Amino acid sequence: MFIDRLIENIKSKKSPVVVGLDPRIEMTPQFIKDIAFKKRGENIEGVCEALYLFNKGIIDAVYDIVPAVKIQVAFYEAYGIEGFKAFFKTAEYAKSLGLMVIADVKRGDIQEVAKMYSKAYLQNQLFDAITVNPYMGEDTIMPYVEDAIKYDKGIFALVKTSNKGSKDIQDIKTTKGEYVYQSVARMINRISNSAIGKYGYSSIGAVVGATYPEEAKVLRKEMPNCFFLVPGYGAQGGTVEDIMDCFDENGFGAIINSSRSVIYAYQTPYWKDVYSEYEYAQAARAEVILMTGMINNGLVKRKYIAC
């Protein structure tokens, strides 16, 4: 099962860190752009080649120390068909090095549309899992659930997201006296029972932001079967202490995504005097190692078992 493979990858790499590949052309090292523009031209094709080359460098630097990468489709979709080519090439390269690939697509629509989105991603061998938006109702995510089970894939449903505005809808009290995100959590946890693996977790997981630690603590209890994909660590403000309650006492239950803080580590105050732009990939590796160590130390302090 997807979830069993994910947990085994976490154990093998001794890390719950997922690297988010969200490249921005304006932040891409100039030497990479020079190579790409010389090869493809200073145009959309060249831009997308630069994004791919940047990603390739990051993947080469971290594939042996992380279980998975998460690729946010918007950073590629913005460039049309060439962007999608870079998106798929990135996934293909990551898979070739043994990484699990999460397509961060956050799809959510009526059933017939959802079936097509699911066909595009969950029926594609390049992707191990996708993110989905369940806020249109249970019927809109069932095509993903059915395909996840059929094709041995995973989904992570948005429950409590890391953005500040999540409270505008997710924190509204329902007529039952609970928050909307709690109602969604209960729905996802119930659905997750259909795909439980040998470690007690389901291939149907949840997105729970690092920026809401108190809510995460509640959700860990309300969603005992669900593995959490945790965004918001690092650049968005989430800390090691904030994410501890996403884990169980065995050190599992969550994968922690970091995008900007890793892939642009060479530009951060901590690393900018150590690594140049030519060493952006080495800086990313150093940041992952640092992040993994901090998380595992946090788990040990909680008397949990580190990865």
Swiss-Prot record:
GO biological process: 'de novo' pyrimidine nucleobase biosynthetic process; 'de novo' UMP biosynthetic process
Enzyme class of the recorded protein, top EC level: lyase
Classification via SUPFAM superfamilies: Ribulose-phoshate binding barrel (SSF51366)
GO MF entries: orotidine-5'-phosphate decarboxylase activity
EC number: 4.1.1.23
Family from the record: Belongs to the OMP decarboxylase family. Type 2 subfamily.
Encoding gene per record: pyrF
Protein name: Orotidine 5'-phosphate decarboxylase
Lyase recorded as keyword: yes
Pathway annotation from the record: Pyrimidine metabolism; UMP biosynthesis via de novo pathway; UMP from orotate: step 2/2
Higher taxonomy: Bacteria, Bacillati, Bacillota, Clostridia, Thermoanaerobacterales
Keyword Transport: no
Keywords in alphabetical order: Decarboxylase, Lyase, Pyrimidine biosynthesis
Active site per database record: 106 (proton donor)
Catalysed reaction equations from the record: orotidine 5'-phosphate + H(+) = UMP + CO2
Cysteines joined through disulfide linkages: none
